[in-house]
Amino acid sequence: MNDFPWLTIIVVFPISAGSLMLFLPHRGNKVNKWYTICICILELLLTTYAFCYNFKMDDPLIQLSEDYKWINFLDFYWRMGIDGLSIGTILLTGFITTLATLAAFPVTRDSKLFHFLMLAMYSGQIGSFSSRDLLLFFIMWELELIPVYLLLSMWGGKKRLYSATKFILYTAGSSIFLLIGVLGISLYGSNEPTLNLELLANQSYPVTLEILFYIGFLIAFAVKSPIIPLHTWLPDTHGEAHYSTCMLLAGILLKMGAYGLVRINMELLPHAHSMFSPWLMVVGTIQIIYAASTSPGQRNLKKRIAYSSVSHMGFIIIGISSITDPGLNGAILQIISHGFIGAALFFLAGTSYDRIRLVYLDEMGGMAISIPKIFTMFTILSMASLALPGMSGFVAELIVFFGIITSQKYFLISKILIIFVMAIGMILTPIYLLSMSRQMFYGYKLINVKNFSFFDSGPRELFLSISILLPIIGIGIYPDFVLSLASDKVESILSNYFYG
Protein backbone atom coordinates (compact mmCIF):
# COMPACT_ATOMS: atom_id res chain seq x y z
CA MET A 1 0.00 0.00 0.00
CA ASN A 2 1.21 3.47 -0.87
CA ASP A 3 1.10 6.09 1.91
CA PHE A 4 0.03 8.97 -0.32
CA PRO A 5 -2.96 8.46 -2.71
CA TRP A 6 -1.15 9.62 -5.85
CA LEU A 7 -3.30 7.69 -8.33
CA THR A 8 -6.62 8.68 -6.76
CA ILE A 9 -5.62 12.35 -7.03
CA ILE A 10 -4.42 11.85 -10.63
CA VAL A 11 -7.73 10.18 -11.61
CA VAL A 12 -10.12 12.48 -9.73
CA PHE A 13 -8.37 15.83 -10.32
CA PRO A 14 -9.32 16.48 -14.01
CA ILE A 15 -13.06 15.79 -13.65
CA SER A 16 -13.25 17.65 -10.30
CA ALA A 17 -11.43 20.71 -11.64
CA GLY A 18 -13.53 20.49 -14.81
CA SER A 19 -16.72 20.56 -12.73
CA LEU A 20 -15.58 23.85 -11.15
CA MET A 21 -15.27 25.32 -14.64
CA LEU A 22 -19.05 25.08 -15.04
CA PHE A 23 -19.35 27.72 -12.27
CA LEU A 24 -16.85 30.15 -13.83
CA PRO A 25 -18.32 33.53 -14.88
CA HIS A 26 -19.29 33.87 -18.55
CA ARG A 27 -16.41 36.01 -19.74
CA GLY A 28 -15.92 34.50 -23.16
CA ASN A 29 -14.17 31.38 -24.33
CA LYS A 30 -10.55 32.28 -23.54
CA VAL A 31 -10.98 31.79 -19.79
CA ASN A 32 -12.33 28.25 -20.31
CA LYS A 33 -9.57 27.36 -22.77
CA TRP A 34 -6.68 28.57 -20.61
CA TYR A 35 -8.24 27.10 -17.47
CA THR A 36 -8.49 23.66 -19.17
CA ILE A 37 -4.93 23.84 -20.51
CA CYS A 38 -3.61 24.79 -17.06
CA ILE A 39 -5.44 21.80 -15.52
CA CYS A 40 -4.02 19.44 -18.17
CA ILE A 41 -0.46 20.75 -17.73
CA LEU A 42 -0.73 20.56 -13.94
CA GLU A 43 -2.10 17.01 -14.19
CA LEU A 44 0.71 15.96 -16.56
CA LEU A 45 3.36 17.45 -14.24
CA LEU A 46 1.76 15.77 -11.22
CA THR A 47 1.67 12.40 -13.01
CA THR A 48 5.29 12.73 -14.16
CA TYR A 49 6.45 13.72 -10.66
CA ALA A 50 4.56 10.83 -9.00
CA PHE A 51 5.99 8.28 -11.45
CA CYS A 52 9.57 9.63 -11.45
CA TYR A 53 9.92 9.50 -7.67
CA ASN A 54 7.80 6.45 -6.84
CA PHE A 55 8.02 4.03 -9.78
CA LYS A 56 10.82 1.43 -9.79
CA MET A 57 11.68 0.25 -13.30
CA ASP A 58 12.97 -3.20 -12.34
CA ASP A 59 9.89 -4.20 -10.31
CA PRO A 60 7.25 -6.12 -12.31
CA LEU A 61 4.76 -5.99 -9.42
CA ILE A 62 2.01 -3.41 -8.92
CA GLN A 63 3.32 -0.10 -7.59
CA LEU A 64 1.68 3.01 -6.11
CA SER A 65 -1.10 0.64 -5.04
CA GLU A 66 -4.17 1.94 -3.21
CA ASP A 67 -6.92 -0.21 -1.73
CA TYR A 68 -9.94 1.42 -0.08
CA LYS A 69 -13.26 -0.18 0.85
CA TRP A 70 -15.91 1.61 -1.19
CA ILE A 71 -19.29 -0.18 -0.98
CA ASN A 72 -19.56 -2.56 1.99
CA PHE A 73 -22.71 -4.29 0.79
CA LEU A 74 -21.13 -5.36 -2.53
CA ASP A 75 -17.63 -5.85 -1.06
CA PHE A 76 -16.47 -3.35 -3.69
CA TYR A 77 -13.02 -1.73 -3.39
CA TRP A 78 -11.40 1.33 -4.94
CA ARG A 79 -8.21 -0.41 -6.08
CA MET A 80 -5.58 1.52 -8.00
CA GLY A 81 -2.07 0.59 -9.06
CA ILE A 82 0.34 0.83 -11.98
CA ASP A 83 2.98 -1.39 -13.52
CA GLY A 84 5.16 -1.32 -16.63
CA LEU A 85 2.17 -2.00 -18.86
CA SER A 86 0.08 0.97 -17.74
CA ILE A 87 2.69 3.67 -17.04
CA GLY A 88 3.39 4.34 -20.73
CA THR A 89 -0.29 4.59 -21.67
CA ILE A 90 -1.05 6.93 -18.72
CA LEU A 91 1.78 9.30 -19.72
CA LEU A 92 0.62 9.10 -23.37
CA THR A 93 -2.93 10.01 -22.23
CA GLY A 94 -1.66 13.05 -20.34
CA PHE A 95 0.51 14.23 -23.23
CA ILE A 96 -2.08 13.79 -26.01
CA THR A 97 -4.96 15.26 -23.95
CA THR A 98 -2.89 18.37 -23.14
CA LEU A 99 -2.10 18.87 -26.83
CA ALA A 100 -5.72 18.13 -27.84
CA THR A 101 -6.98 20.91 -25.54
CA LEU A 102 -4.47 23.25 -27.19
CA ALA A 103 -5.70 22.06 -30.61
CA ALA A 104 -9.31 22.84 -29.58
CA PHE A 105 -8.68 26.61 -29.45
CA PRO A 106 -10.85 27.29 -32.56
CA VAL A 107 -13.90 25.74 -30.81
CA THR A 108 -16.20 28.58 -29.75
CA ARG A 109 -19.68 27.01 -29.49
CA ASP A 110 -20.49 25.76 -25.94
CA SER A 111 -16.81 26.07 -25.09
CA LYS A 112 -17.36 25.43 -21.37
CA LEU A 113 -19.16 22.10 -21.94
CA PHE A 114 -16.65 21.04 -24.61
CA HIS A 115 -13.66 21.49 -22.31
CA PHE A 116 -15.43 19.89 -19.35
CA LEU A 117 -16.15 16.78 -21.49
CA MET A 118 -12.48 16.59 -22.50
CA LEU A 119 -11.45 16.63 -18.82
CA ALA A 120 -14.10 14.02 -17.90
CA MET A 121 -12.77 11.81 -20.70
CA TYR A 122 -9.23 12.35 -19.34
CA SER A 123 -10.27 11.03 -15.89
CA GLY A 124 -12.04 8.01 -17.39
CA GLN A 125 -9.04 7.04 -19.51
CA ILE A 126 -6.48 7.32 -16.69
CA GLY A 127 -8.90 5.45 -14.41
CA SER A 128 -9.15 2.58 -16.92
CA PHE A 129 -5.37 2.28 -17.21
CA SER A 130 -4.74 2.36 -13.44
CA SER A 131 -7.66 0.22 -12.16
CA ARG A 132 -6.72 -2.95 -10.27
CA ASP A 133 -10.33 -4.00 -9.74
CA LEU A 134 -12.39 -5.47 -12.59
CA LEU A 135 -15.64 -3.68 -11.73
CA LEU A 136 -13.79 -0.38 -11.28
CA PHE A 137 -12.17 -0.98 -14.69
CA PHE A 138 -15.65 -1.46 -16.18
CA ILE A 139 -17.01 1.71 -14.52
CA MET A 140 -14.07 3.78 -15.83
CA TRP A 141 -14.47 2.17 -19.27
CA GLU A 142 -18.12 3.32 -19.36
CA LEU A 143 -17.43 6.73 -17.80
CA GLU A 144 -15.14 7.50 -20.70
CA LEU A 145 -17.80 6.64 -23.35
CA ILE A 146 -20.34 9.32 -22.33
CA PRO A 147 -18.05 12.35 -22.98
CA VAL A 148 -16.93 10.84 -26.31
CA TYR A 149 -20.56 10.42 -27.44
CA LEU A 150 -21.40 14.03 -26.52
CA LEU A 151 -18.22 15.38 -28.16
CA LEU A 152 -19.12 13.50 -31.35
CA SER A 153 -22.80 14.43 -31.44
CA MET A 154 -22.42 18.15 -30.62
CA TRP A 155 -19.22 19.20 -32.43
CA GLY A 156 -18.41 17.85 -35.88
CA GLY A 157 -19.55 17.49 -39.49
CA LYS A 158 -23.00 17.27 -41.04
CA LYS A 159 -23.44 13.56 -40.29
CA ARG A 160 -22.16 13.80 -36.71
CA LEU A 161 -25.40 12.47 -35.15
CA TYR A 162 -25.28 9.38 -37.38
CA SER A 163 -21.63 8.68 -36.54
CA ALA A 164 -22.18 9.34 -32.80
CA THR A 165 -25.17 6.95 -32.74
CA LYS A 166 -23.15 4.30 -34.58
CA PHE A 167 -20.28 4.76 -32.12
CA ILE A 168 -22.48 4.40 -29.03
CA LEU A 169 -24.36 1.38 -30.45
CA TYR A 170 -21.09 -0.44 -31.13
CA THR A 171 -19.33 0.47 -27.89
CA ALA A 172 -22.33 0.18 -25.54
CA GLY A 173 -23.32 -3.11 -27.19
CA SER A 174 -19.82 -4.50 -26.69
CA SER A 175 -19.83 -3.26 -23.07
CA ILE A 176 -22.61 -5.77 -22.30
CA PHE A 177 -20.14 -8.57 -23.11
CA LEU A 178 -17.52 -6.85 -20.94
CA LEU A 179 -19.94 -6.64 -17.99
CA ILE A 180 -21.00 -10.30 -18.36
CA GLY A 181 -17.31 -11.30 -18.48
CA VAL A 182 -16.48 -9.19 -15.40
CA LEU A 183 -19.35 -10.63 -13.34
CA GLY A 184 -18.75 -14.19 -14.53
CA ILE A 185 -15.01 -14.17 -13.87
CA SER A 186 -15.46 -12.62 -10.40
CA LEU A 187 -18.23 -14.96 -9.23
CA TYR A 188 -16.62 -18.21 -10.40
CA GLY A 189 -14.10 -20.28 -8.49
CA SER A 190 -13.36 -19.30 -4.95
CA ASN A 191 -15.87 -19.34 -2.10
CA GLU A 192 -15.58 -15.56 -1.82
CA PRO A 193 -16.25 -13.65 -5.07
CA THR A 194 -13.33 -11.35 -5.90
CA LEU A 195 -12.77 -8.56 -8.40
CA ASN A 196 -9.09 -8.06 -7.50
CA LEU A 197 -6.98 -8.41 -10.67
CA GLU A 198 -3.95 -9.69 -8.74
CA LEU A 199 -5.94 -12.58 -7.23
CA LEU A 200 -7.74 -13.31 -10.52
CA ALA A 201 -4.38 -13.63 -12.33
CA ASN A 202 -3.66 -16.77 -10.26
CA GLN A 203 -7.11 -18.30 -10.78
CA SER A 204 -7.71 -21.29 -13.08
CA TYR A 205 -10.95 -22.10 -14.90
CA PRO A 206 -12.45 -25.06 -16.80
CA VAL A 207 -11.47 -24.82 -20.48
CA THR A 208 -15.02 -24.19 -21.79
CA LEU A 209 -15.67 -21.45 -19.24
CA GLU A 210 -12.32 -19.79 -19.91
CA ILE A 211 -13.07 -19.77 -23.64
CA LEU A 212 -16.49 -18.16 -23.00
CA PHE A 213 -14.91 -15.48 -20.80
CA TYR A 214 -12.22 -14.90 -23.41
CA ILE A 215 -14.75 -14.45 -26.24
CA GLY A 216 -16.78 -11.98 -24.14
CA PHE A 217 -13.75 -9.83 -23.36
CA LEU A 218 -12.43 -10.18 -26.92
CA ILE A 219 -15.66 -8.77 -28.42
CA ALA A 220 -15.53 -5.76 -26.06
CA PHE A 221 -11.88 -5.01 -26.81
CA ALA A 222 -12.16 -5.83 -30.54
CA VAL A 223 -14.73 -3.04 -30.98
CA LYS A 224 -12.51 -0.52 -29.18
CA SER A 225 -9.22 -1.53 -30.85
CA PRO A 226 -10.80 -1.95 -33.53
CA ILE A 227 -10.39 -5.45 -34.96
CA ILE A 228 -12.14 -6.30 -38.26
CA PRO A 229 -15.06 -6.85 -38.86
CA LEU A 230 -16.03 -4.70 -35.82
CA HIS A 231 -14.23 -1.62 -37.12
CA THR A 232 -16.91 0.08 -39.25
CA TRP A 233 -17.75 2.73 -36.61
CA LEU A 234 -14.21 4.13 -36.75
CA PRO A 235 -14.03 5.71 -40.27
CA ASP A 236 -17.48 7.31 -39.84
CA THR A 237 -16.60 8.64 -36.39
CA HIS A 238 -13.25 10.08 -37.50
CA GLY A 239 -14.78 11.48 -40.68
CA GLU A 240 -17.30 13.59 -38.74
CA ALA A 241 -15.62 14.40 -35.39
CA HIS A 242 -13.79 17.66 -34.62
CA TYR A 243 -10.07 17.09 -35.06
CA SER A 244 -9.25 17.61 -31.36
CA THR A 245 -11.71 14.76 -30.60
CA CYS A 246 -10.05 12.71 -33.37
CA MET A 247 -6.70 13.21 -31.62
CA LEU A 248 -8.12 11.70 -28.42
CA LEU A 249 -9.82 8.86 -30.33
CA ALA A 250 -6.76 7.86 -32.37
CA GLY A 251 -4.21 8.65 -29.68
CA ILE A 252 -5.83 7.07 -26.62
CA LEU A 253 -9.27 5.48 -27.13
CA LEU A 254 -8.09 2.83 -29.62
CA LYS A 255 -5.19 1.98 -27.31
CA MET A 256 -7.62 1.10 -24.50
CA GLY A 257 -8.81 -1.91 -26.52
CA ALA A 258 -5.26 -3.16 -27.07
CA TYR A 259 -4.44 -2.53 -23.39
CA GLY A 260 -7.51 -4.58 -22.35
CA LEU A 261 -6.42 -7.46 -24.58
CA VAL A 262 -3.05 -7.64 -22.82
CA ARG A 263 -4.26 -6.81 -19.30
CA ILE A 264 -7.29 -9.14 -19.17
CA ASN A 265 -7.30 -11.63 -22.07
CA MET A 266 -3.59 -12.36 -22.02
CA GLU A 267 -2.83 -12.01 -18.31
CA LEU A 268 -5.97 -13.54 -16.75
CA LEU A 269 -6.86 -16.15 -19.40
CA PRO A 270 -3.56 -17.59 -20.71
CA HIS A 271 -4.89 -21.01 -21.81
CA ALA A 272 -7.69 -19.50 -23.89
CA HIS A 273 -5.30 -16.90 -25.34
CA SER A 274 -2.94 -19.68 -26.36
CA MET A 275 -5.82 -21.38 -28.20
CA PHE A 276 -7.11 -18.21 -29.87
CA SER A 277 -3.76 -16.62 -30.74
CA PRO A 278 -3.39 -18.36 -34.17
CA TRP A 279 -6.82 -17.02 -35.17
CA LEU A 280 -5.93 -13.55 -33.89
CA MET A 281 -2.69 -13.75 -35.87
CA VAL A 282 -4.67 -14.48 -39.06
CA VAL A 283 -7.15 -11.66 -38.32
CA GLY A 284 -4.30 -9.21 -37.62
CA THR A 285 -2.59 -10.12 -40.91
CA ILE A 286 -5.84 -9.76 -42.89
CA GLN A 287 -6.49 -6.45 -41.11
CA ILE A 288 -3.17 -4.96 -42.28
CA ILE A 289 -3.88 -5.89 -45.93
CA TYR A 290 -7.60 -5.05 -45.82
CA ALA A 291 -7.18 -1.57 -44.30
CA ALA A 292 -4.18 -0.74 -46.50
CA SER A 293 -6.19 -1.79 -49.60
CA THR A 294 -9.37 0.05 -48.54
CA SER A 295 -7.67 3.32 -47.57
CA PRO A 296 -6.79 4.51 -51.14
CA GLY A 297 -10.47 4.27 -52.08
CA GLN A 298 -11.54 6.83 -49.45
CA ARG A 299 -12.33 10.33 -50.75
CA ASN A 300 -12.59 11.80 -47.24
CA LEU A 301 -9.15 12.77 -45.88
CA LYS A 302 -9.89 11.83 -42.25
CA LYS A 303 -11.46 8.50 -43.28
CA ARG A 304 -8.27 7.64 -45.16
CA ILE A 305 -6.19 8.35 -42.05
CA ALA A 306 -8.71 6.31 -39.99
CA TYR A 307 -8.12 3.26 -42.19
CA SER A 308 -4.37 3.71 -41.72
CA SER A 309 -5.06 3.46 -37.94
CA VAL A 310 -6.93 0.17 -38.51
CA SER A 311 -3.95 -1.13 -40.50
CA HIS A 312 -1.47 -0.15 -37.76
CA MET A 313 -3.60 -1.84 -35.10
CA GLY A 314 -3.06 -5.07 -37.06
CA PHE A 315 0.62 -5.02 -35.99
CA ILE A 316 -0.42 -4.71 -32.33
CA ILE A 317 -2.76 -7.72 -32.66
CA ILE A 318 0.01 -9.77 -34.33
CA GLY A 319 2.49 -8.81 -31.59
CA ILE A 320 0.02 -9.86 -28.87
CA SER A 321 -0.70 -13.13 -30.74
CA SER A 322 2.96 -14.08 -31.13
CA ILE A 323 3.25 -14.81 -27.36
CA THR A 324 6.94 -13.87 -27.37
CA ASP A 325 9.03 -11.33 -25.52
CA PRO A 326 9.89 -9.25 -28.65
CA GLY A 327 6.34 -9.59 -30.03
CA LEU A 328 4.60 -8.26 -26.92
CA ASN A 329 7.24 -5.54 -26.39
CA GLY A 330 6.78 -4.52 -30.03
CA ALA A 331 3.00 -4.37 -29.57
CA ILE A 332 3.36 -2.13 -26.50
CA LEU A 333 5.83 0.10 -28.38
CA GLN A 334 3.41 0.28 -31.34
CA ILE A 335 0.59 1.30 -28.94
CA ILE A 336 2.68 4.28 -27.77
CA SER A 337 4.10 5.05 -31.22
CA HIS A 338 0.77 5.07 -33.04
CA GLY A 339 -0.75 7.13 -30.23
CA PHE A 340 1.58 9.97 -31.23
CA ILE A 341 1.49 9.44 -35.02
CA GLY A 342 -2.31 9.02 -35.29
CA ALA A 343 -2.98 12.10 -33.16
CA ALA A 344 -0.50 14.17 -35.19
CA LEU A 345 -1.97 13.22 -38.58
CA PHE A 346 -5.52 14.04 -37.47
CA PHE A 347 -4.37 17.37 -36.07
CA LEU A 348 -2.70 18.34 -39.35
CA ALA A 349 -5.74 17.14 -41.34
CA GLY A 350 -7.88 19.39 -39.12
CA THR A 351 -5.64 22.44 -39.53
CA SER A 352 -5.80 21.96 -43.31
CA TYR A 353 -9.61 21.81 -43.10
CA ASP A 354 -9.67 25.04 -41.06
CA ARG A 355 -8.05 26.80 -44.01
CA ILE A 356 -9.80 25.38 -47.08
CA ARG A 357 -13.07 23.99 -45.63
CA LEU A 358 -12.81 20.90 -47.87
CA VAL A 359 -12.82 17.28 -46.72
CA TYR A 360 -12.62 15.43 -50.05
CA LEU A 361 -9.16 14.74 -51.44
CA ASP A 362 -10.22 15.03 -55.10
CA GLU A 363 -11.25 18.66 -54.46
CA MET A 364 -7.87 19.57 -52.95
CA GLY A 365 -4.49 20.20 -54.53
CA GLY A 366 -1.68 22.72 -54.81
CA MET A 367 -1.52 23.65 -51.12
CA ALA A 368 2.24 23.13 -50.68
CA ILE A 369 3.16 26.59 -52.02
CA SER A 370 0.65 28.41 -49.81
CA ILE A 371 1.17 26.53 -46.54
CA PRO A 372 4.78 25.20 -46.62
CA LYS A 373 5.07 24.63 -42.84
CA ILE A 374 1.95 22.43 -42.68
CA PHE A 375 3.12 20.66 -45.86
CA THR A 376 6.53 19.94 -44.29
CA MET A 377 5.06 18.63 -41.03
CA PHE A 378 2.45 16.52 -42.84
CA THR A 379 5.13 14.96 -45.06
CA ILE A 380 7.40 14.14 -42.09
CA LEU A 381 4.54 12.58 -40.10
CA SER A 382 3.33 10.61 -43.14
CA MET A 383 6.86 9.18 -43.30
CA ALA A 384 6.59 8.31 -39.60
CA SER A 385 3.29 6.53 -40.30
CA LEU A 386 4.81 4.45 -43.10
CA ALA A 387 7.56 3.34 -40.68
CA LEU A 388 10.56 5.29 -41.96
CA PRO A 389 13.81 4.24 -40.20
CA GLY A 390 14.63 6.66 -37.40
CA MET A 391 10.96 7.05 -36.49
CA SER A 392 9.10 5.18 -33.72
CA GLY A 393 6.85 3.20 -36.12
CA PHE A 394 9.83 1.52 -37.78
CA VAL A 395 11.27 0.19 -34.50
CA ALA A 396 7.86 -1.05 -33.29
CA GLU A 397 7.09 -2.93 -36.51
CA LEU A 398 10.62 -4.36 -36.70
CA ILE A 399 10.37 -5.74 -33.14
CA VAL A 400 6.96 -7.29 -33.97
CA PHE A 401 8.62 -9.02 -36.96
CA PHE A 402 11.30 -10.42 -34.62
CA GLY A 403 8.51 -11.59 -32.32
CA ILE A 404 6.96 -13.70 -35.09
CA ILE A 405 10.32 -15.11 -36.21
CA THR A 406 11.28 -16.20 -32.66
CA SER A 407 7.82 -17.59 -31.77
CA GLN A 408 7.86 -21.26 -30.75
CA LYS A 409 4.11 -21.59 -31.28
CA TYR A 410 3.98 -21.44 -35.07
CA PHE A 411 5.47 -23.64 -37.79
CA LEU A 412 8.15 -22.19 -40.06
CA ILE A 413 5.92 -22.20 -43.15
CA SER A 414 3.14 -20.29 -41.34
CA LYS A 415 5.68 -17.75 -40.01
CA ILE A 416 7.04 -17.17 -43.53
CA LEU A 417 3.49 -16.75 -44.88
CA ILE A 418 2.53 -14.25 -42.15
CA ILE A 419 5.72 -12.21 -42.68
CA PHE A 420 5.16 -12.24 -46.46
CA VAL A 421 1.59 -10.92 -46.12
CA MET A 422 2.69 -8.30 -43.55
CA ALA A 423 5.41 -7.16 -45.96
CA ILE A 424 2.77 -6.67 -48.69
CA GLY A 425 0.80 -4.53 -46.21
CA MET A 426 3.92 -2.45 -45.54
CA ILE A 427 4.35 -1.93 -49.31
CA LEU A 428 0.72 -0.78 -49.63
CA THR A 429 1.10 1.73 -46.76
CA PRO A 430 3.33 4.22 -48.66
CA ILE A 431 0.98 3.96 -51.65
CA TYR A 432 -2.04 5.39 -49.81
CA LEU A 433 -0.06 7.81 -47.61
CA LEU A 434 2.02 9.31 -50.42
CA SER A 435 -0.96 9.52 -52.79
CA MET A 436 -2.81 11.36 -50.01
CA SER A 437 0.04 13.90 -49.76
CA ARG A 438 0.14 14.24 -53.55
CA GLN A 439 -3.61 14.93 -53.80
CA MET A 440 -3.49 17.50 -50.99
CA PHE A 441 -0.30 19.43 -51.62
CA TYR A 442 0.79 18.98 -55.24
CA GLY A 443 -0.94 19.95 -58.50
CA TYR A 444 -2.63 23.27 -59.20
CA LYS A 445 -6.33 23.01 -58.28
CA LEU A 446 -6.63 25.56 -55.47
CA ILE A 447 -3.94 28.04 -56.50
CA ASN A 448 -6.14 29.97 -58.95
CA VAL A 449 -9.43 29.56 -57.08
CA LYS A 450 -10.88 32.83 -55.76
CA ASN A 451 -12.04 33.39 -52.16
CA PHE A 452 -9.42 31.06 -50.67
CA SER A 453 -7.41 32.84 -48.01
CA PHE A 454 -4.36 30.75 -47.21
CA PHE A 455 -2.25 31.45 -44.16
CA ASP A 456 0.46 29.14 -42.91
CA SER A 457 0.55 27.56 -39.46
CA GLY A 458 0.85 29.96 -36.54
CA PRO A 459 3.01 29.51 -33.42
CA ARG A 460 0.34 27.39 -31.64
CA GLU A 461 0.03 24.89 -34.51
CA LEU A 462 3.77 24.74 -35.09
CA PHE A 463 4.44 24.17 -31.38
CA LEU A 464 1.82 21.40 -31.31
CA SER A 465 3.23 19.62 -34.38
CA ILE A 466 6.81 19.76 -33.11
CA SER A 467 5.74 18.61 -29.62
CA ILE A 468 4.29 15.41 -31.12
CA LEU A 469 7.15 14.95 -33.60
CA LEU A 470 9.91 15.05 -30.95
CA PRO A 471 8.79 11.91 -29.04
CA ILE A 472 8.26 10.07 -32.37
CA ILE A 473 11.89 10.74 -33.35
CA GLY A 474 13.10 10.21 -29.76
CA ILE A 475 11.50 6.76 -29.50
CA GLY A 476 12.74 5.91 -33.02
CA ILE A 477 16.34 6.69 -32.05
CA TYR A 478 16.21 5.34 -28.49
CA PRO A 479 13.30 2.84 -28.12
CA ASP A 480 14.71 1.51 -24.82
CA PHE A 481 13.14 4.54 -23.15
CA VAL A 482 9.71 2.88 -23.63
CA LEU A 483 10.80 -0.77 -23.75
CA SER A 484 12.58 -0.60 -20.37
CA LEU A 485 9.32 0.43 -18.67
CA ALA A 486 7.44 -2.71 -19.69
CA SER A 487 10.14 -5.39 -20.15
CA ASP A 488 9.86 -6.92 -16.65
CA LYS A 489 6.06 -6.91 -16.79
CA VAL A 490 6.15 -8.60 -20.21
CA GLU A 491 8.36 -11.37 -18.83
CA SER A 492 6.00 -11.95 -15.89
CA ILE A 493 2.97 -12.19 -18.26
CA LEU A 494 4.78 -14.62 -20.57
CA SER A 495 5.82 -16.82 -17.61
CA ASN A 496 2.22 -18.16 -17.66
CA TYR A 497 2.84 -19.65 -21.11
CA PHE A 498 4.84 -22.78 -21.88
CA TYR A 499 6.70 -21.25 -24.81
CA GLY A 500 7.88 -17.79 -25.79
Swiss-Prot record:
Task: State the annotated membrane topology for this chain.
Answer: Multi-pass membrane protein
Q: List the disulfide bonds.
A: none
Q: Which GO terms describe its biological process?
A: ATP synthesis coupled electron transport; electron transport coupled proton transport
Which reaction(s) does its UniProt entry say it catalyses? a plastoquinone + NADH + (n+1) H(+)(in) = a plastoquinol + NAD(+) + n H(+)(out); a plastoquinone + NADPH + (n+1) H(+)(in) = a plastoquinol + NADP(+) + n H(+)(out)
Q: Which EC numbers does the record give?
A: 7.1.1.-
Checking InterPro entries in the record gives:
NADH_Q_OxRdtase_chain4, NADH_Q_OxRdtase_chainM/4, NADH_UbQ_OxRdtase, ND/Mrp_TM
The record's subcellular location field reads:
Plastid, Chloroplast thylakoid membrane
Q: Which molecular function GO terms apply here?
A: NADH dehydrogenase (ubiquinone) activity; ubiquinone binding
Transmembrane region(s) = 4-24, 35-55, 87-107, 113-130, 134-154, 167-187, 211-231, 242-262, 272-292, 305-325, 330-350, 386-406, 416-436, 462-482
What Gene Ontology cellular component terms go with this record? Answer: chloroplast thylakoid membrane
Superkingdom of the source species: Eukaryota
Could you say which enzyme class this protein belongs to?
A: translocase
Which keywords does this chain's UniProt record carry? Answer: Chloroplast, Membrane, NAD, NADP, Plastid, Plastoquinone, Quinone, Thylakoid, Translocase, Transmembrane, Transmembrane helix
Q: Record's PANTHER family? A: NAD(P)H-QUINONE OXIDOREDUCTASE CHAIN 4, CHLOROPLASTIC (PTHR43507:SF21), NADH-UBIQUINONE OXIDOREDUCTASE CHAIN 4 (PTHR43507)
The entry sums up its family as follows: Belongs to the complex I subunit 4 family.
What name does the UniProt record give this protein? NAD(P)H-quinone oxidoreductase chain 4, chloroplastic
The source organism is Nasturtium officinale (Watercress)
Upper lineage? Eukaryota, Viridiplantae, Streptophyta, Embryophyta, Tracheophyta
